[in-house]
UniProtKB/Swiss-Prot annotation:
Keywords: Amino-acid biosynthesis, Arginine biosynthesis, Cytoplasm, Lyase. It comes from the Bacteria. CDD domains: Argininosuccinate_lyase. Pathway: Amino-acid biosynthesis; L-arginine biosynthesis; L-arginine from L-ornithine and carbamoyl phosphate: step 3/3. GO terms for molecular function: argininosuccinate lyase activity. Gene3D superfamilies: Fumarase/aspartase (C-terminal domain) (1.10.40.30), Fumarase/aspartase (Central domain) (1.20.200.10), Fumarase/aspartase (N-terminal domain) (1.10.275.10). This is Argininosuccinate lyase. Belongs to the lyase 1 family. Argininosuccinate lyase subfamily. HAMAP family: Arg_succ_lyase. GO terms for biological process: arginine biosynthetic process via ornithine; L-arginine biosynthetic process.
Length: 467
């Protein structure tokens, strides 16, 4: 596109002279909203096609505009559009290049439309696409976890609370917890998409237009479910943007949790997992290092996602109806947040699906028996002892075990009987971790049958998603 810095912006038609360069510098948004060129052009093509159908613009002119906008889109995609700060934003860049291609016919395009409803539409179209991209990335992530879970149905390890060994679980059950988390994230993106997929075009600057637009036809052309119902709200509503960034932030927090576990589990101290070399880095100084940067970056990206959400909410806070220029500042967090999530999710998926999990080391971590103390308490409950009484008895046994320097699993039946009269010889069976899991078959529990049922449920769900 030819530079034309002396061109007067369309928004200054009633103003004398040129804008102060300092205001121009403050106002420029093309470096951010330039990423919306495809959505902007798509909305313009639907709008001008409707104008022609309504007899507001000549059909031949509309056809030339639609064809020229295809060319403008291709030029943007090829990097041939040189951004001119004097044109401020993506809308003006598109309109100016269109004018160079079709001449005065370009002037038809903006009939019945304001920048306010135009940018609101662009953002909604972006949000719909972003939700689809995030959903696809999270599905890939779920598949990575599901594949490892299927391979490790029989691998057992300590489950943790407060990062202390708590009770035994299977590795499959542990990994399926992340499949659940990312499933909820996908539901949130679907909800955001549903609310975003309506058209604000026809709302004008704030009060619609006197032209006989067909708003529903535009929405249908764009694949949207309907139209907004209040023009004041439509041009100033950024709820879907905030909801999208919340969904991104929560998914990023979930990614930070597996990121932390990848960091911990790959330490020599834990030794539960080894990352593929393809998903690890070295050190510029220490030649022996193999660093879990993928997990650390996943943790760090959560901070950025939270910051994007808070930044947008702060921009929206206290804005009177309807449109205010503050809303220009929503582009940077909105446009960057979903793409950062997709990048992080794909990297974590690759790390998980190529990781090696060390079953022997995980089972070794259960060896001292304290992770099965709850089973000993429930042994008494099965024999009619109130739980609090049983809890106290096993607590005394745990304290004795610590003083004696012997694992609870190595205490004798006679010693157990000193802590409660209802302990008998078979109490020692409580310290068989695999037996413990077999006794935990409630829906959602880590028992083998319960876990297999969840594996089948998720395989069916993700199979349908792929189909």
């Amino acid at each position: 596109m030819r530079a034309n810095s002396k061109a007067k912006p369309v928004s200054r038609a009633a103003l004398a002279g040129e804008a102060d360069p300092r205001l121009v510098a403050l106002s420029v948004s093309i470096q951010d909203d330039g990423a919306l060129y495809a959505e902007d052009i798509r909305g313009s093509q639907a709008h001008v096609s409707m104008l022609a159908a309504q007899g507001i613009v000549p059909k031949a002119a509309a056809r030339r505009i639609v064809a020229a906008l295809d060319q403008v889109r291709a030029e943007f995609a090829a990097g041939k559009i040189r951004f001119d700060p004097a044109l401020e934003d993506v809308h003006t860049h598109v309109e100016r290049r269109l004018g160079e291609l079709v001449g005065k016919d370009a002037g038809y395009l903006h009939a019945g439309r304001s920048r306010n409803d135009q940018v609101a539409l662009d953002e909604r179209l972006f949000i719909v696409g972003a939700c689809d991209r995030c959903d696809a990335a999270l599905e890939r992530l779920q598949r990575a976890f599901l594949g490892q879970a299927r391979a490790h149905e029989r691998t057992i390890l300590p489950g943790y609370t407060h990062l202390q060994r708590a009770q035994p679980v299977s590795l499959a059950h542990h990994l399926l917890a992340y499949v659940e988390m990312f499933g909820r994230d996908r539901e949130r993106f679907a909800e955001v998409r549903r609310r975003a997929a309506i058209s604000p075009l026809g709302s004008g600057a704030l009060a619609g237009t006197t032209l006989p637009l067909d708003r529903e036809a535009v929405a249908a052309r764009l694949g949207l479910a309907g139209v907004t119902h209040n023009s004041l709200d439509a041009v100033s509503d950024r709820d879907s943007a905030a909801e999208l960034l919340f969904a991104c932030a929560l998914a990023a927090v979930h990614l930070s949790r597996i990121g932390e576990e990848l960091v911990l589990w790959t330490t020599k101290e834990f030794g539960f997992a080894t990352l593929s070399d393809a998903f690890a880095t070295g050190s510029s100084l220490m030649p022996q290092k193999k660093n879990p940067d993928v997990g650390e970056l996943a943790r760090g990206r959560a901070g950025r996602a939270l910051g994007d959400l808070v930044a947008l909410l702060a921009i929206l806070k206290g804005l009177p109806l309807s449109y205010n220029r503050d809303l220009q500042e929503d582009k940077r967090p909105l446009l960057g947040g979903p793409e950062a999530l997709v990048l992080t999710a794909d990297a974590v998926a690759g790390a998980v699906e190529t990781a090696t999990f060390h079953a022997a080391r995980m089972e070794e971590a259960l060896g001292s028996g304290e992770a099965l103390a709850t089973d000993a308490a429930e042994y008494l409950v099965d024999r009619g002892v109130p739980f609090r009484e049983a809890h106290e008895a096993v607590g005394k046994a745990a304290a004795f075990s610590a003083r004696e320097g012997r694992p609870m699993a190595r205490l004798t039946a006679a010693e157990w009987a000193t802590f409660h009269r209802r302990f008998e010889k078979d109490v020692l069976r409580c310290f068989d971790a695999r037996r413990s899991l077999r006794r935990r078959e409630l829906p959602g529990a880590p028992g083998p049958r319960a876990v297999r049922a969840e594996l089948r449920r998720w395989e069916k769900a993700l199979g349908k998603a792929r189909g």
